[in-house]
Amino acid sequence: MIDFDGYRPNVGIVICNRKGQVLWAKRCGQNSWQFPQGGINDNESAEQAMYRELHEEVGLQPKDVRLLYVSKHWLRYKLPKRLLRYDSKPMCIGQKQRWFLLQLVGDEKNINMKTTKSPEFDGWRWVSFWYPVRQVVSFKRDVYRKVMKEFASVLFTDNPPIFSASREANSQSNSANKKYSQTKYTKRHFYKSKGQ
């Protein structure tokens, strides 16, 4: 499903642990790392797509995570010309993404990159909060900077908000910011993580 402007609707997923680190995934057969992400199918909400992608790409179930926040706006990036498929109709020029911030509440042993026949990732690790902004492929960097800045403003408060999973993605950004989590983060969790 591609919109009138040529962007494919997509969800992006940032999973944090209790130390304030984020899950960073290695694309299969490449030395390229990114957050889990995936397209939204027809007749599927952004939230439904997020949970489907969460399971397909990292093997986690809804019970393994707590939804903390949803980005207020759709964020877009354009694909480089070398990645465009000029023969496809309609042509996709990039992705427009709704981003979800999740906290891992289950066991990290449940993370499994091989839940499908064609996995997206073949490795993962925990990295410091801001590490992905500097390390992601250049054409995604602006989106990563915006989403991490938005998520940081949530996580750096004494009471980070959570989202009620029963609401649709459209209303998530409004309602998500009014609920609060029991986990309290401080700024130091995100600036220095061991090994980074």
Swiss-Prot record:
In this chain, the stretch annotated as Disordered covers 166-196
Q: Which Gene3D superfamilies match?
A: Nucleoside Triphosphate Pyrophosphohydrolase
The EC number(s) this enzyme carries? 3.6.1.-
User: What Pfam families would the database entry show?
Assistant: NUDIX
Task: Identify which cofactors the protein needs according to its UniProt entry.
Answer: a divalent metal cation
Q: Where is the composition biased (Basic residues)?
A: 185-196
Q: GO CC terms on record? A: cytoplasm
Q: Where is the composition biased (Polar residues)?
A: 167-184
Q: Which GO terms describe its biological process?
A: mRNA catabolic process
- Annotated motif Nudix box, positions: 38-59
Q: Which top EC class applies here?
A: hydrolase
Q: Which UniProt keywords apply?
A: Hydrolase
Keyword Hydrolase in annotation: yes
Q: Which CDD domains match?
A: NUDIX_Ap4A_hydrolase_plant_like
Annotated Nudix hydrolase domain residues: 6-149
Q: Which domain of life is it from?
A: Bacteria
GO MF, any single term: mRNA 5'-diphosphatase activity
- Family as reported in the entry's similarity comment: Belongs to the Nudix hydrolase family. RppH subfamily.
Q: Main role? A: Accelerates the degradation of transcripts by removing pyrophosphate from the 5'-end of triphosphorylated RNA, leading to a more labile monophosphorylated state that can stimulate subsequent ribonuclease cleavage.
This protein is called: RNA pyrophosphohydrolase
Query: What's the encoding gene here?
Result: rppH
